[in-house]
Amino acid sequence: MRDSPDEVSVDELVNMAVAGGIDEGTALDALQGKLDPYKVMRAAHEARLKIVGEHVTFVVNRNINFTNVCINRCRFCAFRRDPDDPDAYRMTPEEVGERAAEARDAGATEVCLQGGLHPEATFEYYLEMLDEIKSQAPDIHVHGYSPMEVKYCAKLAGEDIEDVLRELKRAGLDSMPGTAAEIFSPEVRKRLCPDKLEADEWEHIIRIAHELGIPTTCTMMYGHIDSPRDWIDHMKRLRGIQEDTGGFTEFVPLSFVHSNAPIYRRGGARPGVSGMTDVLVHAVARLYFGPLIPNIQASWVKLGVKLAQMTLHAGANDLGGTLMEENISREAGATEGEQLEPEEIVEIIREAGFTPVQRTTLYEPVKVY
C-alpha cells in the first residue's frame, strides 16, 4: 500500500488506463491536486497514444440551432428566449433542410440539430425537420436531439420514449448528442437546471437509444457550482452505461462559459475553472475511461484554440467540429468564434504536432492530411 497517492508512477497510471481505466479514487486524487498534474498529463498522453495513436480527428459539420425559444429556464443558458422577445426565432423544417444542403455543398458530412423546447412545437415538427434534411441532403449524417428534446417529443406525442426514438430513427435520425447531461448531481441540478430532465431520465433515454442502434456522445459541463467529487460521480455513471451498452462514441468535457450565464451574472456561480484544471479534466477522463470510451474531445469553442491544443498533449484526441455557426456558446459569452474552416483546423492540429484526420460522426476516417 502506498503511503501517499503521489507515489503512483506515470507507468502505473498508463498501465491502469490501458487495462480498463484508473479507479475513481485515483481519478479524484488527480483532480484534487493530490497527484503531480504534469505526471497525470504525461500519463494521459501516453495512454492516448497506446489506445488511439497520434492522429487528431475532426468532423466537418454544421450546427443548426433551430429555435432559441424554450419553456425551460436553465440558469446557465444565455441562449434561450421567450416567444415574445424581439430576437426570438424558430426555423421552418424547409429552412432547416436548406441549411443542411448548404452544409453538404460546403463539404460537411454532418449536421448537428438542437434547439430550445418551443411551446408551440409538435412532434410532427421534429419529424419534418428530419424529413427535410434527408430530402435535401440525403447523404448527410443527422446528429440530433438531446435526451431533453427526446423527452419533450414523447410528451408532445403522448408516446413512450422507445416509440418516439423508433419514429425519429425512421425519419432519419442517425445519432444523438449526449448533451443535457450537465452534471448528474441532484443537488447541483436543482440549482443549475431545475426544469431539465433528471439524471435517471437522461440515462434511461440514452440506454434505449443504444438498444435501438442509435449511438450517442456523452458530455459533462463543469466549472460552475460543482466539485471534483461531482465530476468523478458523473464520469462513473457514464462508464457504467458504456460497460453495458458500448453506445458512446466520445466523451466531451464542456468547460462552463460564464460571461453571460444568468447564474454567474447573479453571483451564483464561479467563472469557470483554471486552464490547468481544464487540461486536467481531459487528462483524467482519458485515464479513467481508458479504452472503454476511446475518443476524448476537446471543445475548441469552449476552451479556445490554444488551450484545446494543450489538451491534445494531455489525453484528448479529437477537436470536434468545424461547426459553421454555434449560437449557444456564443450567447453564453464564448469568444472563439462560430466556425473554423477545415484548413484552419488542420493547421491547428499540425501546429500542436499531430497528424490531422477528417472523420465521420462515427469516427470513420475520411481524409488523412
Curated annotation (Swiss-Prot):
GO terms for molecular function: 4 iron, 4 sulfur cluster binding; 5-amino-6-(D-ribitylamino)uracil--L-tyrosine 4-hydroxyphenyl transferase activity; 7,8-didemethyl-8-hydroxy-5-deazariboflavin synthase activity; iron ion binding. Its cofactor is [4Fe-4S] cluster. [4Fe-4S] cluster binds at residues 70, 74, 77. It is an enzyme of class 2 (transferase). Its EC number is 2.5.1.147. Binds 1 [4Fe-4S] cluster. The cluster is coordinated with 3 cysteines and an exchangeable S-adenosyl-L-methionine. Pfam families: CofH_C, Radical_SAM. It catalyses: 5-amino-6-(D-ribitylamino)uracil + L-tyrosine + S-adenosyl-L-methionine = 5-amino-5-(4-hydroxybenzyl)-6-(D-ribitylimino)-5,6-dihydrouracil + 2-iminoacetate + 5'-deoxyadenosine + L-methionine + H(+). SUPFAM superfamilies: Radical SAM enzymes. SMART domains: Elp3. Residues 56-292 form the Radical SAM core domain. Catalyzes the radical-mediated synthesis of 5-amino-5-(4-hydroxybenzyl)-6-(D-ribitylimino)-5,6-dihydrouracil from 5-amino-6-(D-ribitylamino)uracil and L-tyrosine. Belongs to the radical SAM superfamily. CofH family. HAMAP family: FO_synth_sub2. NCBIfam families: CofH family radical SAM protein, F420_cofH, PRK07360.1. This is 5-amino-6-(D-ribitylamino)uracil--L-tyrosine 4-hydroxyphenyl transferase. It comes from Methanopyrus kandleri (strain AV19 / DSM 6324 / JCM 9639 / NBRC 100938). The gene is cofH.
